[in-house]
Amino acid sequence: MISMKRRMLLGSAGVALAAPMIMTRAAVAQQSGAETSMDIDHAMPPETHRFNVGKFEVVVVKDGARPSEKPQETFGTNQSPETVGALLEANFLPADKFVNSFAPVLVNTGSDVILFDTGLGEGGRQNGLGRLVEGLTAAGYKREDVTTVVITHMHGDHIGGLMEGGQPAFPNARYVTGQAEYDFWVDPARVGTPAENGQKGVLANVKPMAEKMTFIGDGGAVVSGITGMAAFGHSPGHMIYRIESEGRQLVLTADTANHFVLSLQRPDWEVRFDMDKAAAAATRSKVFDMLATDKLAFLGYHMPFPAVGFVEKVDQGYRFVPKAYQFDI
């Protein structure tokens, strides 16, 4: 098993070796006259965040971030643009723009190195995304160290990094995913439907690993201390995962909520990417009611990096409370 000392040394070396490239990219951005905070973010080494859940080490990697306009076309699609904009402004956010970030997670149990989702991979790199492997390297992990890859669901921003150059990106890994999710996406009935394009990605990136896959359902174990929970709606077999070690817990909520304001404060608002919008809304309320009631920490794939926090029940939904030093003491 890779040691903490080695990880820290490798992480420091990665930053040092990256420095000339950072300077080159920054210089190019400045010369273009169009440098933004996103340009700077893409030029820097990928952000990583490390903390412990009991004896388990958790490393969050920022695979990238993508700014977009017209948030009401993605979130609150059953609301007026004015209503969506007003909620954003009430939370000190612009009414006409939003940023979507992507946060795969690695959990080192001491005997297993488990990666949850793989980001956008090669297809995102021309836009400054797909930085998972780069981030893992900065954190002291090689692709070969990963023993298990868990796929929460099979949308492109979660499975895009499964393959690298036509070969498995994590060559020593076995794979775990939900049975219902896999069955939906490989079904030939998807051809000719809105899911056909997504199916192409699954057939290219997921199906080649089918012989190395373990399929689970609600309550299925990945390893001791990590349990799958059905959270259907965002996709037909969307799964979330409870991590527990030495009495500490963290729930990986994947895409149950995709925005820390628009999805959490208004869990009943429809989201364009939710495949079954009514089921997704019901799942949001169920999952975040549990987290708020039990005061459990969660990590959401699209929450503001490092994507970890808690939720407090408020009038119409939930308030996101970012992680501070709870896991450090």
Language-model features: locations:
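N-terminal export signals
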Residues: I2-S3, M8-Q30
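Divalent metal-coordination and catalytic microenvironments
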Residues: K55, V107, D117, V146, ...
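Metallo-beta-lactamase
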Residues: G135-Y141, D145, N172-A230, A282-K286, ...
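C-terminal segment of N-terminal export signals and the immediately downstream linker at the start
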Residues: M23-V59
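Active-site metal-binding motif and surrounding structural segment of the metallo-beta-lactamase
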Residues: D96, P104, Q126-V176
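Active-site metal-binding loops of divalent metal-dependent hydrolases
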Residues: D63-G64, T118-G121, M154, A180-E181, ...
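Cap/insert and terminal regions of metallo-dependent hydrolase folds
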Residues: K5, E246-I329
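Conserved beta-strand hairpin/beta-sheet module of binuclear metal-dependent hydrolase folds
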Residues: E47-A139, I240-T256
